[in-house]
């Protein structure tokens, strides 16, 4: 796949994501335990209007909402995210298609070393704050 097609697929994914609704579980607004964690759960009740996909009821996830397969799971910049804990893990990355995300357990001193080495290797760091 060439670079032009890859960029086009990233734009298509961004457009699809803008239109995609938040898929929340049935009656998430009704119970406090669902409000705090309103992740998707498939409606299974025999009288469930949402399961029957009736008009006016919240949407359900289906295959049509997915993004193009070649760019699925990538960072919005187009890089594959790789979690890095030290400089050795950083050196195993491919700068053309992978970007580093420094783990939250890494301290300030080691974080500075990783950022410095990433600049030398030409690797993009997604969270470079010091």
From Swiss-Prot:
Enumerate the InterPro entries for this protein: Ribosomal_eL32, Ribosomal_eL32_arc, Ribosomal_eL32_CS, Ribosomal_eL32_sf
Q: Which Pfam families match?
A: Ribosomal_L32e
CC terms in the record's Gene Ontology section = cytosolic large ribosomal subunit
Q: What is this protein called?
A: Large ribosomal subunit protein eL32
Q: Does the keyword Ribosomal protein apply?
A: yes
Organism lineage: Archaea, Methanobacteriati, Methanobacteriota, Thermococci, Thermococcales
Alphabetized UniProt keyword annotations: Ribonucleoprotein, Ribosomal protein
**GO molecular-function annotation terms?**
structural constituent of ribosome
Q: What are the recorded Gene Ontology BP terms?
A: translation
GN (gene name): rpl32e
Recorded family membership: Belongs to the eukaryotic ribosomal protein eL32 family.
Q: How does it assemble?
A: Part of the 50S ribosomal subunit.
- What is the annotated signal peptide range for this record? none
């Amino acid at each position: 796949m060439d670079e032009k097609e890859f960029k086009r697929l990233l734009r298509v994914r961004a457009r699809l994501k803008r239109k995609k609704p938040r898929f929340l579980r049935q009656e998430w607004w009704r119970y406090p335990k669902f409000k705090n964690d309103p992740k998707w759960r498939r409606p299974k009740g025999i009288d469930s209007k949402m399961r029957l996909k009736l008009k006016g009821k919240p949407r359900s996830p289906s295959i049509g909402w997915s993004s193009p397969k070649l760019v699925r799971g990538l960072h919005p910049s187009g890089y594959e995210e790789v979690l890095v804990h030290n400089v050795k893990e950083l050196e195993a990355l491919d700068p053309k298609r992978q970007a580093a995300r420094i783990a939250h357990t890494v301290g300030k001193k080691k974080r500075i070393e990783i950022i410095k080495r990433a600049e030398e290797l030409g690797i993009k760091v997604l969270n470079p704050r010091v």
